[in-house]
Amino acid sequence: MATKNEEILRKPDWLKIKLNTNENYIGLKKMMREKNLHTVCEEAKCPNIHECWGARRTATFMILGAVCTRACRFCAVKTGLPNELDLNEPERVAESVELMNLKHVVITAVARDDLRDAGSNVYAETVRKVRERNPFTTIEILPSDMGGDYEALETLMASKPDILNHNIETVRRLTPRVRARATYERTLEFLRRSKELQPDIPTKSSLMVGLGETIEEIYETMDDLRANDVDILTIGQYLQPSRKHLKVEKYYTPLEFGKLRKVAMDKGFKHCEAGPMVRSSYHADEQVNEAAKEKHRLGEEKLQQN
């Protein structure tokens, strides 16, 4: 018999979605396996994969392998000892972006604390190869904190992505429990330095709620991000990937997410997505700056001509 606590935390109706595994989705998944590529959309069990891959022509590639050197207690990505770097991965990602005809691509990576450069050189080369082959596709990067190696960050920012995304994930108090190998202050410093290196590139971060934080702590995190010149914020519901991961302490209602979005915009964020199903890359194609939107427009014109 379920306990009272389990009854309260039963997944609410607004989190139950019908997955549309259409032919486009199945075909793209087959191509990923054939090219030995990984998307965080699949690895992290994102609920929006069908909308992004189909209707919005966006996808998030996970590079530097499929095994992470960290074991964050919210994340579904495999952890352990990673394989050797695949130096052909940048070209394969670029080719796949072209074949998928993506409007916007997010390039994320597992943490590679085992590498001297944290994987930054292969990461930057992936951005360059994608841009060479797909001049009208906007590129967002979502790196780890690179172990606090700011030479690695300089390498990444020199590749000139259209958005730099680095996730705060949770509030200050919960950070040691949620992601023990990262620190709250290092995340803020990473975001601040990114903006200092490339002031014209929008910076972005994401916050999960439902891990036991208070509303006041959420507002404090918003203030901390704005104090470090973060432009874009996404806020979504934490969902427990398995019983081995942290439990959900609270399910926020769509109305509560609406209020969080309003507060974020009032605090000065240029763009905020907030909702039960929102993830870091949700509607990412809408968050680029005006110069990047011009790329989208030119790309659409080229598509129509073809």
Curated annotation (Swiss-Prot):
SUPFAM superfamilies: Radical SAM enzymes (SSF102114)
Keyword field contains Transferase: yes
Pathway in which this enzyme or protein is active: Protein modification; protein lipoylation via endogenous pathway; protein N(6)-(lipoyl)lysine from octanoyl-[acyl-carrier-protein]
Classification via Pfam families: LIAS_N (PF16881), Radical_SAM (PF04055)
Catalytic activity reported: [[Fe-S] cluster scaffold protein carrying a second [4Fe-4S](2+) cluster] + N(6)-octanoyl-L-lysyl-[protein] + 2 oxidized [2Fe-2S]-[ferredoxin] + 2 S-adenosyl-L-methionine + 4 H(+) = [[Fe-S] cluster scaffold protein] + N(6)-[(R)-dihydrolipoyl]-L-lysyl-[protein] + 4 Fe(3+) + 2 hydrogen sulfide + 2 5'-deoxyadenosine + 2 L-methionine + 2 reduced [2Fe-2S]-[ferredoxin]
Region (Disordered): 283-306
Cofactor needs: [4Fe-4S] cluster
Record SMART domains: Elp3
Enzyme Commission (EC) number: 2.8.1.8
Molecular function, one GO term: lipoate synthase activity
Residues the entry annotates as binding [4Fe-4S] cluster 1: 41, 46, 52, 281
Subcellular location: Cytoplasm
Key word Cytoplasm present: yes
Membrane-traversing stretches: none
Residues annotated as domain Radical SAM core: 54-270
Keywords: 4Fe-4S, Cytoplasm, Iron, Iron-sulfur, Metal-binding, S-adenosyl-L-methionine, Transferase
CDD domains recorded: Radical_SAM (cd01335)
Stored InterPro entries: Aldolase_TIM, Elp3/MiaA/NifB-like_rSAM, LIAS_N, Lipoyl_synth, rSAM
Residues annotated for [4Fe-4S] cluster 2 binding in this entry: 68, 72, 75
Manner of cofactor binding, per the entry note: Binds 2 [4Fe-4S] clusters per subunit. One cluster is coordinated with 3 cysteines and an exchangeable S-adenosyl-L-methionine.
NCBIfam families named among the record's database cross-references: lipA, PRK05481.1, PRK12928.1
Assigned protein family: Belongs to the radical SAM superfamily. Lipoyl synthase family.
Protein name (record): Lipoyl synthase
Organism: Staphylococcus haemolyticus (strain JCSC1435)
